[in-house]
Amino acid sequence: MSEKRGYVELPRGGCVVQTSQGPIQFGAPPETIKDSLGTETGVPEILVLPREMFNWSKGINVADMEFPIYYHFFIRGKRPLICGTMEQARLLAVALQEAVFGPKNFDLRDDSIDISDDVFVPDIRGEMAFFRGELTLKSLFRYRPFKDGRLVVGDVEIAIDGDDYEVRDGGRHVATIPGRITYTARFDVGDALPEPFKPPRFGVTCLGPSHGFDPKDNTSGFIIWLNHNGVMVDPPVNSTEWLLRSNVNPKFIDSIVLTHCHADHDAGTFQKILEEGRVTIYTTKTIMESFLRKYSAFSGESVDYLRRLFSFQQVFIGRPVTIHGGEFDIFYALHSIPTMGFRLSFQGKTFVYSSDHQGDPQVQRTMLDQGAMNRERYEQLQHFPWESDVIYHESGIAPLHTPLKFLASLPEDVQSRTVVYHIASKDFNAIGETALQRATFGIENTLYFETEPSVYEDAYRALDILKRLDFFESLPVKKVQEFLSIIERRHFARGEKIIEEGSKGDYFYIIESGNAIVMKENLVRGKQLGAFEYFGEVALLTGSDRTADIVADTDLETIVIPRDRFLNFVSGTEFGRILQRVIDRRDNRTWNLLVESDSFARLSDYQRMWLESYLEPLAYSEPRTIVAEGDRLPGLYIVSDGRVEVRDGDGGVRSIERGGVIGYLHRIMRDEPARYTYSSSGPVEMLFMPRSDALELIDRNPGLTMRIGDPSA
């Protein structure tokens, strides 16, 4: 932890000030409780909400009060004090209702298509009421609102000062706290692979084995690999950076299974949504609507807007859903909020995930006797699929979690197939010698199932690559058939030159796995290419010589298409039109600008390449107003040379120079007016993306809405 200007910065984010009332924490990104648990002063009992509760650039909630509340109330028997505005109180209550007690109104019949004798739809409201008891949000924590921009706790006064907080103690100024909170991921990686990871046909990679109160281990979450694609289950908040540091391309994961809305299971979901492409989330309608209400409250965005950022695939009780060839049969677990587990079948192998679940038969019997569940639900819970080949089962603190002693009482054959997660190492080891095994995180510890390739595997993999290329979506079936007939596969060793500058073009390349680098003298940095990215199209479509060297940065697996076949394939297609546009607008000066500008720092090279294809040069030689306050933003502007003045209604002036942006994709998408007037006092050169093109780009990459541009535009 670093100390500055009267406060301490927590490693993951947020600030702590020592006062006469004890430590006060400002902001709470996910898992900051792990930072404070090991300190002398412990977890602060007073927490101040940040000025903005959601950090869109990181895709995370930075006002995660769930675990501080759980810790103080359920472990210490205290009611923490949370401070913020009255509007934040309202929003926090909405979010915590979903996270702590679950939705107020729901009907699991919405999660079933076929309500018949062979499809049992439980009524879990009694179970949720059993776990809730007499608790209310008011019984869990205290809330103190700011009045006229200030609040007092004992001798401590906290005042809102613009975007920041001023803290005085006993009349003495002690700290100025930034009101906007960032997040820094902290996690163990394990042994990173020397070469990029190649996803297996069927496997499981544990991202973390433990729970949200364990400062020593990663929080639980895992990836299921099916037909060489990844399905992330309950992504931890750091999952994407974990993958990158482990030498795993995050683009292999195109789907999420969301089991419930506790912070240690849903906190990383929006991080994944804000990556390249459009992610598909699989869950029930009940859980999805709860998730949207929770994050609408934290982010301040409407539920309708959040829905536009990803694809939702509803799953149903009693109707298995197929994801990458695996059949998922879902069921509702026994927990305090709606929570689903699933049994997965793939090529004769089975894997079951309990999710958070109270699996103790004695507790279930008590709930039956007290009328919290009916006999049919009790019988369903008693018939957990212990016969599965691999059992991923949680264990934790009662009453919400399965006690380890119950799992240790299972027959040895069942124990030997059971992997226990959601538990700290010290707690697992305390049970003594058993046949159980604790989940082992790390890409090097991926569990591989023995399977055989299907007769269609090569075609499936080729089509999977095809669908990942954004512009192939509009191809008719006959073109897809043609694609399968014209492709070849090629391997390149690390360091091997694939394309030489000045040579004639003979192939179009698509990367299946591994990395390549584009090397050209006038680029400020070589372009990095990874899985599902392509190259070599310029020389084929223009007849010109190759314009750069491309070298295999790792061992590389590619799909290639010979020149004549490629030209015939793209002729007259939307794909060909888009490729030609990319070629026409590609410019090394534009690329260098996008690489050098902080405005595009969080974009991948592939996203920069796509953005580059939409940008048009625009120049004004005389002073002029570019966008007036109140006008609809016609598109996105990037200053490439010159200066643009920004004036607000109060007469304040600032300037935008090279790499600066006018507009914000989020506001452009919603056709909202500009908040400031932008004008040039002399010659200025810019790059411009019209609103129609911006909407097309956003549809393919929804996460870009919060990553490009000035939020204040």
Model-inferred region functions:
Residues M1-F131, K138, D360-F449:
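Cap/insert and terminal regions of metallo-dependent hydrolase folds
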Residues A28, L207-H211, P235-N238, C261, ...:
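Active-site metal-binding loops of divalent metal-dependent hydrolases
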Residues V121, E127-D214, N218-G221, L226-V231:
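Non-catalytic propeptide/linker segments at domain boundaries
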Residues P122-D155, R180-I181, G190, K285-T339, ...:
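Metallo-beta-lactamase
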Residues N249-E276:
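Di-metal (Zn2+ and/or Mg2+/Mn2+) metal-binding site signature of metallo-dependent hydrolases
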Residues V279-E289, R417-H422:
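Short internal beta-strands
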Residues F316-A372:
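Catalytic core of the metallo-beta-lactamase
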Residues E433, N445-A713:
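Cytosolic regulatory regions built on CNB/CRP/Popeye-like sensor folds
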